[in-house]
Amino acid sequence: MSFLSIFTFFSVLISVARAVRFDLTNVTCKGLHGPHCGTYVMEVVGQNGTFLGQSTFVGADVLTESAGDAWARYLGQETRFLPKLTTIASNETKNFSPLIFTTNINTCNPQSIGDAMVPFANTVTGEIEYNSWADTADNASFITGLANQLFNSTDYGVQVASCYPNFASVILSTPTVNIFGKDDTLPDYCTAIQLKAVCPPEAGFD
């Protein structure tokens, strides 16, 4: 993959950081279907209380329409009404909710993430997106096995990074979460991150 940096907001040490394989055997949550199977949240290693999740915000088109039209869109559960930005943040961050990943009851391997929305990757920036219209974009690619890619990065030959690639992410003070090839040099607006499995109650999530 190649990544073109148009705007550079944050400069970090450029490195070819390789994520490690994550082992769920060191995590034991109470009340699960087996010693290590169940649901987990993903905490960023080295950043206590920072988790992988989604921030929601009201789009500009909603702010310019009538209250009646906006209410109808909300009741219709239109995904575009409240766009979701895949990001990392603390539990106390407003409009933020963690992504919950579920393990396979037989193998305990990461199986699925979050709700029923299908993740897509922007093939230009590598940004993970959950927008319902992402699959129709020319530069979108369906991500299979996203949970395993995030937790077993070495096996899948990818790096996971938090990035401030565009104006919106800086204004919202919220980084995007991007996937890069294992041999790619990260853009100077990205920082490599690693994730670990954490039991939701222990992390402060119900």
Curated annotation (Swiss-Prot):
Signal sequence residues: 1-19
GO cellular component annotations of the record: cytosol
Swiss-Prot/TrEMBL keywords: Cytoplasm, Signal, Zinc
Compartment(s): Cytoplasm, Cytosol
Induction of synthesis: In zinc-depleted conditions and has increased expression in NAP1 deletion mutants.
Main localization of the protein described in the UniProt heading: cytoplasm
InterPro entries assigned: Vel1-like
Family: Belongs to the VEL1 family.
Name of the featured protein: Protein VEL1
Species: Saccharomyces cerevisiae (strain YJM789) (Baker's yeast)
Organism ancestry: Eukaryota, Fungi, Dikarya, Ascomycota, Saccharomycotina
Gene of this entry: VEL1
